[in-house]
């Protein structure tokens, strides 16, 4: 889809100039007859930057010839304006004027002198949001131009000294992605490391683990459900690569490979009422509603509701999933004050969830192609229940000073009856030892900040000061039951657990993270050179009790982490950047398979250096980056079974990505990630030079869409995914082969009277290949194998009223 929908204009004679101007006005949106005034805050800056910010806030698209604004400055604006009045104020005395060229679209031209003809110069898109809270999509609609960057606010990807990809709700719908794990399958830097039919989702970014706990919700950590995140609630999903603690603070589980932010849905200016009926193999049937409205004077108030119910059997035998979600989003847009609130509740019940397959010292890596049945017992289950809420506020103190803040909370109850799958020999035998595991969580989190725009001579500044606080307490408990034998290739049904053989200790843990960050983005040469310098002070406090007895591994530590980034806009199409980022992570916790189970280790620091380039052709964009991330490595000693630090992990990699619509009706989304992951400084040098576990050398993704000529509304889709081989252990004695997955699909959009209908069908893993997709696990878990998802059919019908 084109970024700007313009009217077709023809050159006119000088005598027809008044008619030409009238035709332009007729192309303007209907609301131009009755101007709607809103409060805008645009700080003094270069004229191009000021116009871009105003277009973003106004929710319109602006196109211009960059040469027109070169070297020009703007005093900005503050107050209530219509779109017309805002442009007029910003352009006053510039010798330029704005002209409407379509619905919600404008261009910039030199103001004509008396008796001169009016000509429109070649243009490039520089800004404009679709609606407040919704980012302008890049060509093709799969990726958004802007993404959330925590402390620094929302920025265009071409003005960001980091690697970031923001996926739109449109790509979520078209991929029929039900969870975050299904959406990230499109990103080569991200991989799922837990079975799709498992108790929870878990990922890696740039080779380092990321948990659902580390996924932010509108900038707040710990709000979203712990084990699985439904995508029907997401307006946009931002994935930023590399440590980002300067931007977002320390994450609950200390992920350093990158961060993910889920942006909630907001009511747009146009009413929306959509119902989606869905089917997923083997017999999962469900429905979803999406309703949005604005009301009040000037449409100040908005409400958006999303609800989902889906239940049935999966493609695995005796496995079923029942998921429910309800999320309500409210917002208020005043002259200076903007408020939003989100309330959500999710429930997910899974019968016979799969676990990662652990491999004993005397067993080889099993043949995944021979695993044709669900090895999880029919009595095993996972029951999760999450209730969450968040309140966000922004207030324009002046035309150059913004105050913002947010608070959030979550209560969760989780109940599992599970068993490990630890293969002990080449025949695939393992022991089923049932474990009842309960976990209750309570989270409270808050953040507040100030953002100041100012000019010192020729240098612009964007100063950011922010403070954050995160509190979480959780209680773990459970029981163990008598063991029984089973087999990976020929599962044996074992009795439903009855009387426990022993009860686990009741462990209560409190985490408190607090921090203050300060950053300044300096703009030189009309903001063509942007330098961001900053640091974040953070304090990490962890306390734990076991059966009421305080543990001896609690800690209270603090650290200042400096970070910085630089971006050079070589041209309007080419940006070069570099960054140095530090990340503080909560200390690892010894897993249940180690003899020092639940021992808490001190926090540690990770460091990244990255350089990159971004090229925007207008309809298609390419990005490239080279990075290096170092952090301490941990492992459970195979002989002593003691968990602890063992050396450092050094990931050096290259990322390439592409997205957009290079040819009308053809859209692409994909990329490549190469990683050279090396272990160093291990105990006695035993593993020095070995490849770090769970890190493929190559990840490749490529997805394409084709609008079939001659059949309006029909689109065919295809996607290929590849990961190369990866090791299971630091010794590099066991590894899995590389794998490929192919997906195919189609959708058909049409109208019945005034009702919009979209039919979607897709097949994931078309070839029904069985393979181990990952050896991934965080350092504080036993490494295990993730089995691929069988061929899965997805069907849906969306009706918009």
Predicted regions and their residues:
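Surface-exposed extracellular loop regions of Gram-negative outer-membrane beta-barrel proteins
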Residues: 349-363, 471-480, 567-610, 621-646, ...
């Amino acid at each position: 889809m084109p970024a700007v929908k313009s009217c077709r204009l023809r050159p006119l004679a000088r005598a027809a100039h008044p008619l030409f101007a009238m035709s332009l006005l007729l192309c303007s949106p209907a609301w131009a007859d009755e101007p709607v005034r809103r409060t805008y805050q645009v700080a003094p800056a270069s004229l191009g930057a000021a116009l871009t910010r105003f277009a973003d806030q106004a929710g319109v698209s602006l196109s211009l010839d960059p040469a027109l604004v070169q070297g020009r400055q703007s005093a900005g604006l503050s107050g209530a304006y219509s779109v017309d009045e805002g442009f007029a104020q910003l352009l006053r005395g510039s010798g330029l004027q704005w002209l409407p060229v379509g619905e919600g679209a404008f261009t910039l031209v030199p103001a004509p002198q008396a008796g001169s003809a009016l000509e429109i110069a070649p243009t490039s898109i520089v800004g404009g949001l679709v609606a407040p809270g919704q980012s302008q999509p890049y060509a093709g609609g799969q990726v958004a131009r802007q993404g959330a960057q925590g402390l620094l606010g929302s920025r265009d990807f071409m003005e960001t000294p980091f690697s970031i990809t923001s996926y739109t709700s449109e790509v979520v719908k078209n991929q029929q992605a039900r969870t975050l794990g299904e959406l990230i399958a499109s990103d080569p830097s991200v991989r799922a490391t837990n079975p799709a039919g498992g108790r929870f989702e878990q990922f890696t970014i740039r080779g380092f683990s990321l948990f659902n706990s580390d996924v932010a919700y509108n900038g707040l950590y710990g709000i979203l459900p712990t084990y699985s995140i439904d995508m029907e609630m997401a307006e946009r999903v931002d994935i930023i690569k590399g440590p980002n603690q300067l931007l977002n603070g320390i994450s609950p589980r200390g992920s350093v490979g990158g961060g993910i932010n889920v942006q909630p849905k907001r009511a747009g200016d146009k009413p929306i009422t959509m119902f989606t009926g869905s089917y997923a193999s083997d017999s999962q049937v469900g429905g979803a509603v999406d309703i949005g409205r604005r009301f009040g004077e000037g449409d100040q108030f908005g409400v958006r509701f999303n609800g989902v119910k889906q239940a049935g059997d999966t493609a695995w035998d005796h496995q079923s999933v029942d998921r429910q979600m309800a999320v309500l989003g409210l917002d208020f847009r005043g002259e200076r004050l903007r408020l939003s609130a989100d309330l959500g509740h999710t429930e997910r019940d899974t019968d016979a969830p799969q676990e990662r397959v652990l491999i004993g010292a005397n067993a080889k890596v099993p043949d995944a192609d021979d695993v044709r049945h669900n090895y999880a017992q029919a009595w095993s289950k996972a029951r999760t229940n999450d209730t969450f809420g968040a309140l966000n506020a922004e207030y324009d103190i002046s035309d150059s000073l913004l105050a913002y803040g947010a608070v959030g909370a979550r209560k969760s109850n989780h109940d599992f009856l599970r068993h490990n799958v630890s293969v002990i020999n080449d025949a695939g035998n393992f022991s089923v030892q049932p474990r009842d595991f309960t976990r209750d969580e309570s989270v409270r989190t808050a953040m507040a900040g100030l953002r100041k725009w100012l000019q010192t001579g020729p240098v612009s500044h964007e100063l950011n000061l922010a403070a954050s606080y995160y509190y979480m307490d959780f209680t773990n408990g459970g029981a163990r039951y008598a063991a029984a034998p089973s087999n990976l290739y020929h599962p044996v049904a074992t009795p439903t657990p009855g009387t426990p053989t022993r009860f686990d200790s009741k462990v209560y843990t409190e985490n408190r993270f607090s921090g203050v960050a300060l950053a300044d983005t300096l703009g030189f040469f009309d903001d063509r050179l942007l330098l961001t310098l900053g640091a974040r002070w953070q304090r990490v406090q962890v306390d734990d009790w076991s059966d009421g007895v305080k543990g001896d591994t609690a800690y209270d530590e603090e650290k200042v982490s400096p970070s910085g980034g630089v971006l050079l806009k070589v041209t309007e199409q080419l940006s070069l950047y570099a960054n140095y980022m530090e990340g503080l992570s909560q200390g690892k916790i010894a897993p249940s398979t180690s003899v020092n189970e639940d021992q808490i280790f001190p926090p540690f620091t990770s460091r990244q250096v990255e350089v990159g380039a971004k090229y925007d052709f207008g309809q298609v964009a390419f990005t490239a980056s080279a990075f290096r991330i170092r952090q301490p490595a941990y492992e459970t000693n195979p002989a002593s079974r003691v968990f602890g630090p063992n050396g450092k992990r050094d990931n050096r990699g290259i990322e390439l990505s592409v997205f957009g619509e290079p040819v009308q009706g053809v859209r692409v989304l994909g990329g490549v990630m190469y990683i050279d992951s090396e272990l160093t400084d291990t105990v006695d040098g035993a593993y020095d030079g070995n490849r770090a576990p769970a890190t493929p050398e190559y990840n490749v993704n490529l997805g394409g869409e084709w609008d079939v000529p001659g059949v309006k509304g029909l689109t065919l889709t295809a996607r290929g995914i590849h990961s190369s081989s990866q090791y299971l252990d630091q010794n590099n004695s066991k590894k899995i082969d590389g794998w490929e997955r192919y997906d195919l699909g189609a959708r058909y959009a049409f109208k019945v009277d005034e009702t919009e209908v979209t039919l979607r069908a897709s097949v994931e893993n078309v070839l029904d290949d069985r393979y181990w997709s990952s050896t991934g696990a965080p350092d504080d878990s036993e490494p295990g194998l993730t089995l691929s998802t069988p061929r899965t059919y997805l069907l849906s019908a969306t009706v918009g009223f």
